């Protein structure tokens, strides 16, 4: 049962991060979250409009 709870928690966190990145994708270049010894870095690749 604890493994199932951990898996559900991980899925919720991943979906939340994906939704956040999707909502601010036009103004977000990079995201860095740090909690204890864990660091999550997300960087978006984009091309400059000419």
Curated annotation (Swiss-Prot):
InterPro entries: Hok/gef_toxin (IPR000021), Hok/gef_toxin_CS (IPR018084). The chain crosses the membrane at residues 5-25. Keywords: Cell inner membrane, Cell membrane, Membrane, Plasmid, Toxin-antitoxin system, Transmembrane, Transmembrane helix. It comes from the Bacteria. GO terms for cellular component: plasma membrane. It is found in: Cell inner membrane. It is a single-pass membrane protein. Pfam families: HOK_GEF. Toxic component of a type I toxin-antitoxin (TA) system. When expressed is involved in cellular Mg(2+) release and degradation of stable RNA. Belongs to the Hok/Gef family. This is Protein PndA. The lineage of its organism: Bacteria, Pseudomonadati, Pseudomonadota, Gammaproteobacteria, Enterobacterales.
């Amino acid at each position: 049962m604890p493994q199932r709870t951990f898996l559900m928690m991980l899925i919720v966190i991943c979906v939340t991060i994906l939704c956040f990145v999707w909502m601010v994708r036009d103004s977000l270049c990079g995201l860095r979250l740090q909690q204890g010894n864990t660091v999550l870095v997300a960087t978006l690749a984009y091309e400059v409009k000419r």
